[in-house]
Amino acid sequence: MRRPERAELVHIPNHFCLLVAAGVCCLANPAGLPSSWFMSVALAQPAALTASQSEALNAYNRTVQDFRSILKERRAQIDAKQKLPEKPGQALYLARVAMMGAYKDLTDVMPSRIGRPNKYKIPPAYFDADNEPLIDEYKNLFRIMQAPPANAQASDTPYKDVVDLGTVIARIKGLDAAHAEVAGRISLAVFFAETDGNQNIGNARSESYKGSFQTGVSEDKIGQKKWAAIKKSVAALDPKLNARDDKEEARVGNSDSRYNHWTGVRNGLMNAHADLFPRIPAIMKALPDPTDQMRFFELIQIIPSPAKAALNSGNLLNYRISEPRIMGYLRNNSMFAYGKADRAKTSATMREILDSMWLFNDIFDRALAKFGEVKAQQKG
């Protein structure tokens, strides 16, 4: 999801501003109800909004309106086949971040506004489930804006390819079968985190990162060179996979290898992750939760040097990052991006960073489910 990235206004009724019992205190008492009944009704009415609550509520409603407006504008442009602005997804991304940040500011001053769970598994303090249709449209628009180019070379087995490549690379790097399987799972999780599980996509928020692993040109070339260095070992270990690799290389020819699913994934893994595969046993010991393992390897995509420094520190979870540039990269990828309290953070430990990656929760759950399907098919 490394993207510099990747309906009607939902009105929050201001129950606190309703007239108390429609002015019931001014009515006669035709039913002969006891005066204590009127007293209990009056006491049951919530107190008026404070200035900070009113400000937060108004700010949130404005951001919902702004988000709805940019979604509507981009949909109209797409439907009319108009030329889209450069990086057409950036305005949508910023509007979504603003809406979720404003909601977090609202729930910080009005905890009672925290509502029900939502299908995207976003913490309810950051997102009103009534706005799910807006996120549905957001995802649909990104799917259109990031559609693979006409010359992209798709795979009939995109998920299996990722697992197979991650697994064989891990074996070449010296892992046993069990730990190599973990590498395959992690590889699939990174693919989902980068592309939402869609192969050969473009990037509506960047002119640099493309394909199934969202790599830049230089990253892709580095990965290609590293793969060439282990090619003979791959051929000896897994002749069938090596034959597939030869076929895909021939298929790519002189075109952009990032837009061939196989080579895009292969080069992306070799560039950023393969050198860390031998350390998977140690990473699993430091991070026993499989979701944390997947989060950490996604951080290798986003902030590779600091993530590796944290691993090398010997105290992974307590390693603190405070460089403003790195904190900016994290915020650009939906960590510490929502609300005044989150954005005020000037540093964070690796534990805090991993915990802040809750926007990836649904993505990793789907990746795990798909990994289970791939393994079941292999055993079947």
Feature roles, as predicted:
Residues 45-138:
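N-terminal pre-domain segments of enzymes
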Residues 42-46, 152:
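Boundary at the C-terminal end of the N-terminal hydrophobic targeting segment
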Residues 13-37:
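Bacterial N-terminal signal peptides
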Residues 145, 149-339:
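Catalytic glycan-binding domains that act on GlcNAc-containing polysaccharides
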Residues 340-380:
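Low-complexity, Gly/Ser/Thr/Pro-rich intrinsically disordered linker/tail segments
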